[in-house]
Amino acid sequence: LSLVGGFHGRTGRPAQFSDSTRASYRAHLATFRGQEDLITVPPNDVDALRRAFAEAEAKDVFIEAIFMEPVMGEGDPGMAVSPEFYAVARELTEAHGAVLLMDSIQAGLRATGDLSVVDYPGFEGLPAPDMETYSKAMNAGQYPLSILAMTEKAAKLYRTGVYGNTMTANPRAMEVGCAVLGMVTDEVRANIVARGHEFLEKLQALAKELDGPITKVQGTGLLFSCELDPAYKAYGTGSTEEYMRLHGIGVIHGGANSLRFTPHFEVTSAEVDLIVQAVKDAMVNGPRRPAT
């Protein structure tokens, strides 16, 4: 079971559990066809989640795992799972013998300055997931490093020698990860939260000022997005994304038609203003879809 709009990777089962790319993968990759083993529910819909487990049980279907991102990075950038929804997911997986895996690869430290979802504000005291994955910010964006954290219960299922890859347990990767964690001070964590709030406030004000081009602003910490009116093309040739990159802003698209932002952890208020002004410039002076 995964969430509508969720994204978990491009290979193997994580790709199969990725709702946001499932249709595209099926269209182009034969190995993804004929698989009807994924249940999806809308994020933060507690009733739908409970109903999915009840219906599966009634049909004698075993839900082996829930995959979900604490903050979405691809399908609906910046959309956060609520503590209530997480708590119910944890409750149901424990009751049904399923695994709860939190995919924090994109969110990680970027969302609140905390590594694990159970350290996010509002999640303190909730039981940990069975597994949680980290990467991206943990490797400073420079070195191949990903981490799988497990509870003691999940670790008992792990078999040494069965899982691995060429880069596993790489000493240099470990040094990079430790160095990054050492640089994430209390001041950096506070900046992640404060600048995240500032970005949202200023982008929401811009959306109101422009009255139309930006249809939604959402985010958690320094993972946030602006959804654009269909008159604007978020990505591809002749897009808003391309225009902003050519004007010095490293933005990337996400969702159906959104601009996704992941600024560095020590971003300043002056840089916030610069980025917001660049968004305004792109909306006012950048490309639009040809009128039909």
What are these regions (language model features)?
Residues 69-82, 97-123:
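Conserved PLP phosphate-binding loop immediately N-terminal to the Schiff-base lysine helix
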Residues 1-65, 84:
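PLP-dependent aspartate aminotransferase-fold enzymes
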Residues 92-96, 210, 247:
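Helix C-cap/helix->beta junction micro-motif
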Residues 196-201, 210-243, 265-268:
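Conserved PLP-binding catalytic core of the aspartate aminotransferase-like
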Residues 153, 172-191, 266-270:
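Amphipathic alpha-helix from the class-I
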